[in-house]
A protein has these predicted regions:
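Outer-membrane beta-barrel proteins
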Residues: 1-294
Length: 294
């Protein structure tokens, strides 16, 4: 309890030095989930797990009109998910955060519509081209102009995770003349691989398109992973479709294919195909959702 108080006071003191924030608002939100998983094989032990988290957040506005916010999430990993951001509708938003953050690339790694999670969710050893996000990363999101939104992220070098730094960029476009259509592209360069996955410099990219017509949404996405030594090269494609049967009930279907090309890396070097059928039903503040993967 004492350590928690010191962290909170330190963060507040830093904010007061940098900004003069008026009428900051504090909030505490929480959630809980109960999950049952079955991998279709003989299995001993309890299949049920529970997820839980509490988020402490504060926001306010500076004398210059900047909106400043900070949040800390308390969960099974204690207080490792944290973030701070500031910005406005004119300049966009600059953020800094811990392990709960996504890079500009990983934020759009799978944009396919679904009723509950991606087609590869829950698959043992799932192979996904999903960028790289680390602890203490900077991010930027621009205001939307003419349907175009730009985002970027920068992860400084870290001796514990990577020798070099990582940069990512993404852009999305929602044209006014085609209602319901969204297209996007993202790319990321890792100047050195993760200590636990990729072993050399890599470049990843993805492009996607989604179209919504009434209650129906369809999407397609293509991604690519290139490494300096060609030992970790891979390509993936994804397809998804979802349908809102009612305000409460949604159903979805998705597929994901991951293919390698001369890939010898143990973490990324196996071809994989997965499909999923999902559904979700919402009653007030409670949602019952499920997915069946193959």
């Amino acid at each position: 309890m004492n350590n928690f108080k010191k962290i909170g006071l330190s963060a507040l003191a830093g904010s007061l030095v940098a900004f003069s924030v008026n009428a900051a608002e504090m909030s505490v939100t929480g959630g809980a989930s109960l999950t049952m998983s079955d991998q279709g094989a003989d299995q001993e032990g309890n299949r049920f797990t529970m997820g839980n988290s509490i988020t402490f957040a504060a926001s306010g506005e500076t004398d210059g009109g900047l909106t400043v916010s900070a949040s800390y999430e308390l969960d099974d990993d204690v207080m490792d998910d944290y973030s701070m951001s500031f910005g406005n509708d004119t300049m966009g938003t600059i953020s800094f955060g811990g392990s709960g953050n996504s890079s500009a690339m990983s934020a759009v790694d799978d944009m396919m519509p679904n009723a509950y999670e991606e087609a590869w969710h829950g698959v043992t050893g799932a192979k996904v081209i999903n960028g790289f996000a680390g602890i203490n990363m900077f991010g930027y999101t621009s205001p939307t102009v003419g349907g175009i939104t730009f985002s970027a992220s920068y992860l400084p070098s870290s001796e514990a995770v990577s020798v070099g730094s990582s940069t990512a960029y993404a852009v999305s476009y929602t044209p006014e003349m085609v209602e319901g259509l969204t297209v996007g592209y993202a790319t990321q360069d890792d100047n050195s691989g993760s200590a636990t996955t990729l072993s050399d410099d890599t470049s990843e990219s993805t492009m996607y398109a989604k179209y919504t017509y009434g209650s129906l949404t369809v999407g397609y996405q293509s991604s690519e992973l290139d490494s300096d030594t060609n030992s970790e090269d891979a390509d993936s494609t994804a397809f998804g479709i979802s349908y809102a049967v009612s305000d409460s009930l949604s159903i979805g279907y998705g597929s994901h294919t991951y293919e390698t090309s001369g890939n010898t890396n143990a973490a990324t070097g196996a071809d994989q195909e997965s499909t999923a059928v999902s559904a979700s039903y919402t009653m007030g503040g409670m949602t019952i959702a499920g997915v069946m993967n193959d």
